[in-house]
């Protein structure tokens, strides 16, 4: 049986490399329920992907804007909740410190 950390490392890898609408939803759910912080998720991603780069990841988070609200609805996410999702993802992005980004 997989440990939750292993599952979340895979979810972070998916968000980092594929960045599909469902990948944003998976990470948002893990953070929203309080099980993980973005910092912990990045640590997990770094354990499975030696090339994981927080600066690239932070920049990649803006790609959420390429999805229409309806694309999130395919996964049972209410369209009315999408603006709040986008705001949370923006907060993740600005939440990285210069030290975490290698600046």
Task: Pin down the residues of each PLM region.
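Compositionally biased terminal segments of proteins
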Residues: 1-103
């Amino acid at each position: 049986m997989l440990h939750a950390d292993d599952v979340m490392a895979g979810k972070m890898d998916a968000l980092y490399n594929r960045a599909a609408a469902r990948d944003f939803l998976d990470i948002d759910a893990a953070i929203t329920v309080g099980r993980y912080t973005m910092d912990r998720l990045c640590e997990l991603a770094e354990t499975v992907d030696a090339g994981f780069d927080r600066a690239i990841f932070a920049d990649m988070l803006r790609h959420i804007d390429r999805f229409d609200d309806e694309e999130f609805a395919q996964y049972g996410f209410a369209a009315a909740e999408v603006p709040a999702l986008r705001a949370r993802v923006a907060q993740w992005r600005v939440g990285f410190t210069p030290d975490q980004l290698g600046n």
